Amino acid sequence: MTTIIDYGIGNLRSIEKAFETVGATVHRTDDPAAIAEAERLVLPGVGAFRACIDEIRRRDLEGPIHDAIGRGVPFLGVCVGMQLLFETGYEKGEHEGLGVLPGHVAHFRETDAGMPDELTVPHMGWNAIEPTRDHPLLDELGATPYVYFVHSYHPVAEDADDVLTTTSYGHTFPSVVQRDNVFGVQFHPEKSQAAGLGLLDNFAALPTTEEAGRTVST
């Protein structure tokens, strides 16, 4: 069972439908106990970093999220949900994230002052993801699959080992991150056609406990 965390922000039906398309059993919940005990978790996210993390905390979901990650539950953050995995977000201020992965989230033009003007922000549309290593999450997606992005901010990972794929847009940024049982994708898999569905199918097939050899500190 794949559980989608419902914290009241965004249209969750699209990601839910994408999982159903690949044959996964999926449901949504905002119940802290159900999240803490889930077999597999997805944290979607759209909009502003602060609004998302504030709502997660208002609903007392941060603790259950950490509990589930600590149990080895496969966990996937999508778009802003991926950004929330990092320590700090700098969208309209400085905001504390979930702190699962070391690093921060910054605006494209703040991380690259020399970014060409013809590259508009937000980064919107299809772009390639370049794997840094093999992983079951990326199985059968092709050497450089194209996926769909809509974002103005991106993570800056402190640990290069956490970066599973990179994407170039003015500069190179992490587009998929992974540490043990924790995964994050900056793009929208539910909008990324075959590559996106393939990634969700791979995630749904991951074992409950990842044998990655690195421990996530929560």
From Swiss-Prot:
One cellular component term from this protein's GO annotations in UniProt: cytoplasm
Active site (catalytic residues): 79, 188, 190
Domain Glutamine amidotransferase type-1 as annotated: residue spans: 1-213
Gene Ontology molecular functions: glutaminase activity; imidazoleglycerol-phosphate synthase activity; lyase activity
Highest taxon, organism lineage: Bacteria
Subcellular location: Cytoplasm
Coiled-coil annotated residue ranges, if any: none
Catalysed reactions, semicolon-separated: 5-[(5-phospho-1-deoxy-D-ribulos-1-ylimino)methylamino]-1-(5-phospho-beta-D-ribosyl)imidazole-4-carboxamide + L-glutamine = D-erythro-1-(imidazol-4-yl)glycerol 3-phosphate + 5-amino-1-(5-phospho-beta-D-ribosyl)imidazole-4-carboxamide + L-glutamate + H(+); L-glutamine + H2O = L-glutamate + NH4(+)
Documented EC number(s): 4.3.2.10, 3.5.1.2
Pathway info: Amino-acid biosynthesis; L-histidine biosynthesis; L-histidine from 5-phospho-alpha-D-ribose 1-diphosphate: step 5/9
Main location as per UniProt: cytoplasm
GO-annotated biological processes: L-histidine biosynthetic process
Keywords linked to the UniProt accession: Amino-acid biosynthesis, Cytoplasm, Glutamine amidotransferase, Histidine biosynthesis, Hydrolase, Lyase
InterPro entries named among the record's database cross-references: Class_I_gatase-like, GATASE, Imidazole-glycPsynth_HisH
Function recorded in the entry: IGPS catalyzes the conversion of PRFAR and glutamine to IGP, AICAR and glutamate. The HisH subunit catalyzes the hydrolysis of glutamine to glutamate and ammonia as part of the synthesis of IGP and AICAR. The resulting ammonia molecule is channeled to the active site of HisF.
Self-association state and partner proteins as the record states: Heterodimer of HisH and HisF.
Protein name, UniProt field: Imidazole glycerol phosphate synthase subunit HisH
Native species: Salinibacter ruber (strain DSM 13855 / M31)
Gene from which the chain derives: hisH
